[in-house]
Swiss-Prot record:
Protein's name according to its UniProt entry: Thymidine kinase
Gene from which this protein is expressed: tdk
Database matches in Gene3D superfamilies: 3.30.60.20, P-loop containing nucleotide triphosphate hydrolases
Residues where Zn(2+) binds: 145, 147, 182, 185
Active site location: 88 (proton acceptor)
Catalytic activity: thymidine + ATP = dTMP + ADP + H(+)
Organism field: Shewanella oneidensis (strain ATCC 700550 / JCM 31522 / CIP 106686 / LMG 19005 / NCIMB 14063 / MR-1)
Signal peptide start-end: none
Main location: cytoplasm
Superkingdom per UniProt: Bacteria
Family label: Belongs to the thymidine kinase family.
Assigned GO CC terms: cytosol
Amino acid sequence: MAQLYFYYSAMNAGKSTSLLQSSYNYRERGMNTLVMTASIDDRYGKGKVASRIGIESDAQVFSSHDNLIEMITAAHQENHLSCVLVDECQFLSKEQVKQLTYIVDKIDIPVLCYGLRTDFQGELFSGSHYLLAWADKLVELKTICHCGRKANMVVRLDGEGKVMREGEQVAIGGNESYESVCRKHFREFIWD
């Protein structure tokens, strides 16, 4: 029986690496996967999922208005899918998370979602909110703060490396723009 998984973490915990490894494991056994990523994140090129350790895969891109049932069923009819893997799932809409539950419940294809839990102000992303509510399995991927504690929050940095307290929820960037920190340091940077 298929399930909906949400693998979440702060930045730099290996979410994309884990997604690419899972896809590889299926493919190595002769099974087809569909790798998807949000169109808003084009750091590694449009239609690519890439890891900081240097591995990458082509991916089908989705925007917040796309119907994932249509996209996935079309891919399933073309290549019988054994698994769907979604990177940057924090950018999913509520309706799209609901559509992924349909893929799992009605079409019986496992869906593995990978993304951030919260933004740089400690607020849930929409996709993460509904995945936390509706996923069958929640898996936290861990990374560490500069102090050695588990990092479960993210802070945004300006061009000079200073922590930003305000701004748009979504600003695409990597290590130059974000730092994963523990809640204690998040509190010092953002709340205090």
